[in-house]
């Protein structure tokens, strides 16, 4: 004590020695990077936040406990499917531990035809310093640093051993102080495992407002240097799991089965997630079962469409048509679903398909869309010239419309009405559609009809390099390769296409592009 007291003194922040939050996350994509990932996460909390989980550990209401744990894990992973979870509190250490296991969708991006991963779930990626000091009256007020906090996170990402070489981009190490916060990260990549160890620790109570511009620049620079991965072109895609390779899907399928088994009697979510997984990996019979289970719980138009698409792939056209009709009865916007029209045509009911378009023309908000739909069904009905004339009439009004140009090119190709003038239309469609894969595919068909097989093949190679999941182009490329005498390569394309999208084969047979 001092006579007369003492002035205020600045109290320096003492960095915490024990993490408030320590997370160990394991993401298993050893089966393939284009598949859902199995996650295992352990989260340890200390201090005040741990006390809340102490109370949660004592709650007997399993649903309430699971909901809370789902939200806790979501704060790290975002959307996920929780299969198993637990919470425990150690009184002696004061540490709460949450453990969870489940599935996340594949976070790899294939937007430019190269699979890349901006590695998610990094603590540093969520660091920000967005503070408004634009108003003059508060411009000089110091900015409070979030804290005191101390986070530790370890991420282990398992990769396929036979998925080709993975390239690590970005910084392999970060060790800097930004805005009064210490950010440390180290990254390593083995052939089939990515490991990241992070720490985020506050060191100061506040920073001067004048430092904000530098802090924002440093934050942006740091985030742009965070590690990311690039896969090679040999990486297996989800539609390539056929034959013996399907055994690799087993661990993921087991988690989906667990989610379905634990679902409430009126819940559809678990069935729909499994439907998507099965459909995308070529298990259309399993997908149909899941869609049927979803319909039994929620007879929505979307669920009927799901089952219709599975039935279509299984060549059950009557079932597919019934489900498309059921979806349209619930939601009239689905009345003119393209695959419904195709199904009618393949069943030999082309007059019904034409009548359906004519009788429901009021559903088209734009006349050009009606012209495109009519041209398609008229072609199936043996009236292709009439349909193409309708497209030309619309093009006279909108000569640069990419959709109309592509429809004229495509319909001329599938119904064998291609001329040299058609090819000019196809090239304009490619130009107006900014070289879209769909327009290039249409031009390839026109080139094929003209016997210009090498040019058609070049176009199709471009399409499938950009959009490897556009399986209809594989059917067409198989036809082109056969015309060039490259039978083995044609069979390879057909094998992939028939596994991934067997339903499309019926159309290519109807158009004379594929043998029965």
Residues covered by each model-derived region:
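Start-of-helix register in tetratricopeptide repeats
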Residues: 269, 302, 335-336, 369, ...
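Terminal, low-structured helical/coil segments at or just beyond the last alpha-helical repeat
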Residues: 487-516
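Register position in tetratricopeptide repeats
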Residues: 280, 313-314, 346-347, 380, ...
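Residue-level recognition of tetratricopeptide repeat
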Residues: 276, 309, 342, 376, ...
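Canonical tetratricopeptide repeat
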Residues: 273, 306, 339-340, 373, ...
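Structural marker of alpha-solenoid helical repeat scaffolds
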Residues: 262-263, 296-297, 329-330, 362-363, ...
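A sensor for short, sequence-defined functional sites
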Residues: 1-263, 267-269, 276-279, 309
């Amino acid at each position: 004590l001092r006579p007369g007291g003492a002035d205020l003194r600045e109290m320096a922040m003492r960095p915490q020695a024990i993490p408030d939050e320590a997370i160990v996350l394991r993401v298993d994509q050893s089966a393939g990077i284009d598949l859902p990932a199995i996650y295992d996460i352990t989260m340890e909390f200390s201090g005040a936040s741990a006390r809340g989980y102490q109370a949660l550990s004592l709650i007997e209401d399993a649903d309430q406990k699971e909901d809370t744990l789902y939200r806790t894990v979501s704060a790290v992973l975002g959307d996920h499917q929780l299969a198993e979870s637990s919470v425990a509190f150690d009184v002696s250490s004061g540490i709460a531990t949450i453990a969870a296991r489940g599935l996340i969708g594949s976070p790899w991006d294939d937007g430019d035809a190269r699979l890349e991963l901006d590695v998610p779930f990094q603590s540093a990626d969520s660091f920000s310093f967005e503070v408004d000091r634009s108003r003059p009256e508060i411009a000089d007020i110091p900015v409070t640093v979030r804290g005191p906090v101390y986070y530790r996170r370890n991420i282990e990402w398992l990769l396929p051993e036979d998925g080709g070489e993975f390239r690590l981009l970005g910084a392999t190490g970060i060790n800097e102080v930004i805005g009064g916060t210490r950010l440390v990260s180290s990254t390593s990549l083995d052939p089939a495992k990515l490991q990241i160890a992070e720490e985020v620790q506050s060191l100061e109570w506040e920073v001067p407002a004048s430092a904000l511009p530098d802090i924002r620049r440093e934050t942006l620079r740091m985030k742009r240097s965070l590690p990311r991965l690039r896969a090679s072109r040999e990486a297996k895609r989800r539609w390539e799991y056929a034959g013996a390779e399907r055994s690799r899907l087993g661990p993921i399928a087991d988690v989906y089965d667990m989610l379905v088994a634990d679902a409430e009697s009126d819940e559809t979510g678990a069935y729909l997630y499994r439907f998507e997984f099965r459909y995308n990996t070529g298990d259309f019979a399993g997908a149909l079962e899941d869609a049927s289970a979803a319909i039994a719980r929620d007879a929505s138009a979307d669920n009927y469409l799901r089952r219709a698409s599975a039935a279509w792939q299984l060549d059950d056209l009557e079932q597919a048509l019934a489900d498309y009709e059921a979806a349209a009865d619930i939601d009239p916007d689905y009345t003119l679903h393209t695959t419904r029209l195709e199904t009618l045509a393949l069943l030999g009911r082309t007059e019904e398909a034409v009548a359906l378009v004519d009788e429901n023309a009021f559903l088209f908000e734009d006349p050009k869309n009606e012209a495109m739909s009519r041209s398609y069904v008229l072609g199936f009905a043996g009236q292709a010239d009439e349909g193409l004339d309708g497209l030309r009439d619309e093009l006279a009004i909108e000569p640069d419309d990419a959709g109309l140009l592509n429809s004229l090119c495509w319909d001329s190709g599938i119904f064998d009405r291609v001329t040299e003038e058609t090819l000019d239309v196809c090239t304009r469609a490619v130009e107006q559609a900014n070289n879209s894969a769909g327009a290039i595919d249409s031009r390839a068909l026109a080139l094929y009809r003209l016997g210009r097989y090498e040019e058609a093949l070049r176009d199709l190679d471009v399409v499938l390099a950009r959009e490897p999941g556009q399986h209809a182009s594989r059917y067409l490329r198989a036809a082109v390769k056969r015309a060039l005498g490259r039978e083995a390569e044609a069979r390879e394309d057909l094998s992939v296409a028939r596994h991934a999208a067997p339903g499309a084969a019926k159309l290519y047979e109807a158009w004379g592009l594929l043998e029965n």
